Amino acid sequence: MSKKAFQSQLSYSMKTEYPTYNQLRAGLNYSSPYLYEGGNPDLRPETRHELSLLSRYMKSSLMINYTAVVDQIIQVPTLYADNIMLYRPDNHGVNKYLSLSISQRVNWGDFWECALRMDYQTQWMRVAGFTRERGDGYMLKADNTISLSNHVQCFVNGAYRSASENGLFRIPRAWNLDVALNFSLLSDRLNIYLECADVFSTLHGKRTYDGEHITMDYSRNYQTRTFTIYVSYKLSNLISSKKYKGNTTNDEIKRL
């Protein structure tokens, strides 16, 4: 193993984040018949400690990140009145988060290139009224580039995300598939890019929350499939002018 082939970096950072003016407000805002939002004038700044390790070897990479947040500011939903939920920020002890990412690039000649990645994350949270103190989840992703010819490329990208914990909310599993074609024509002067993102429209906003005296099931189903067409053309230099190129002072005098 050569020193150039292997690279590693270890870093640590600490920063203090102060609450925003919106989080410090004392009043309540009406968001919907079932949701009020408010601030908290007693909020304290949160301190974030972060330790990261990044390693690379040829076409493989590894990234590990550990974060501990002291007095973390978290927007916690509570029961305000019958069938009315109140969103209000508060400081909550020391919460810890760990994430791991592994990636690998694989080539099959000049025809097929695949970038594989696996992400794992877990958290340890202590919030009053929160039923889950620990939660984890993972994601698998594969980005494929297929060269059909020197002027045509096909992109097929897929991802799968397991059910996971994200803060106070539980996110259900999801998957998606994106496909695209890129054409380079007329001596690479004309470029046409066609893309269909989320082909099967599977990326919907869903999450659930189980807390003290309150349970929330959020679901937003809508059309997430999108189409993109991008066309570009490189124009030649339409304005060509002959410039005088003199080499001596006499040439310049003659030109004048």
Could you tell me what each predicted segment is?
Residues T122-M125, L140-S184, L190, F200, ...:
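C-terminal beta-barrel architecture of Gram-negative outer-membrane proteins
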